[in-house]
Amino acid sequence: MKKIIRIFFIISLVCFSFFYTDKVMNLLNSKDPLMVKLNNIKKDYEVLPVNAIIDNDTIVPGKKGLEVDIDKSYEEMKLGGIFREESLIYKDILPSSSISNNKDKYIVKGNSNNEVSLIVIYNSLTKQNITNISNITIYLNHKDITNTNIKKLKKQELYTYGNNGVYTKEILDNDNIIINKLSNNKSKYCLLKEKNSTYLNICNNNNMLVVIPSIIGGYNNIKNNLTGGSIILLEDTSNIDIIIKYINSKGYTIVPL
């Protein structure tokens, strides 16, 4: 019995020792000028999250925020003992409302005031004009999702357009395996020109989101309706260079979805 009590006492002493040491180290660190500096400046570097905008069954995705990870930043800088802005380490602040908890909504716009997305559906009419253009998003029909095409289009973000906009589980399973293996992105967006709850459910069940462009057409439609966050489906690529120059001239950057 005495032996058991002694062992219990030793274990308790060791645990207390670790606990006490940890408390002492935390206290010492909190008084370190570097830690004081990090706590004083953390608000200056904070970027608040932006909540998603939801209107019935449509959504404009939100944005994650950022805050300084005090402990990791301190560990990164403590060897030198001085504050270095370039060594700050951040962690995400998630919005309370985002696409991650509203996947059953149609995405109808991006969340940036100075960025737009340009989508092209790959076919015999468009393929000659898009191969070497970066930052556009390309949708391929099921029959066009081949090793050759995907390797040729590796500069772009690639997704499946199903069978000319008709999605089934079998098509998504097949196409996503190929895209995820060969392209530089994961296949996570379906494309619809209008709302369709059947395709929305099929895509959601395959862990994909559904995008409906805010602008569909050519130069005139873009010129008349272009705003920050626009998702543009370009149906005629014969003057894509002119369209890209126009978008850039209005101060917008073209980004993938």
Predicted feature residues:
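Metal-dependent polysaccharide deacetylase catalytic core of the NodB/CE4 family, i.e.
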Residues: 116, 126-220, 226-231
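A short, well-structured beta->alpha microelement
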Residues: 102-107, 215-221
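Terminal accessory/targeting
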Residues: 1-118, 130-137, 227-257
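Short, glycine-rich nucleotide/cofactor-binding loops
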Residues: 121-125
